[in-house]
Amino acid sequence: MTIEKKLEDLGLVLPDPKPPLGAYVPYIERDGLVFISGQGPVLAGGGAICGRLGDGLDIEDGARAAQLSALNILAQIRAAVGSDWQKLVRIVRLCGYVNATPDFTHHPAVVNGASELFVDLFGERGRHTRSAVGVASLPMDWVVEIDAIVEIS
């Protein structure tokens, strides 16, 4: 089953890759690793999930934003492998930044929205190392930003 079909079965659609917001590239491939710049919860039709967890947004809102960020990571992976998903060896690492109030402490539960999607799609190849970090703000007031390292053949 293709990644696109698996996403469809989950009620999700793989978006087009988003251009960078600044003076950087969306990914760099080096020695079989692809380093993917931070991806936010940007919607396919424009707009994004914005705000701070603990200030009107809850864990479920954050997990949905993390899942959307993961979809945008997948769009960059697809660009890097030329749509040949067989080249993806595994998801190696995620670092999730969570826009949250000082008293919000459920950062791992939020970033699970991304981690669980990768496992649902790729099984063991989707399991990865990870950090989940709370921050005072993010670009564009995003709820979550996630960067990734993936291995390709």
Language-model segments: which ranges?
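Short, polar/acidic, helix-capping and beta-turn segments at strand->helix junctions
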Residues: M1-S153
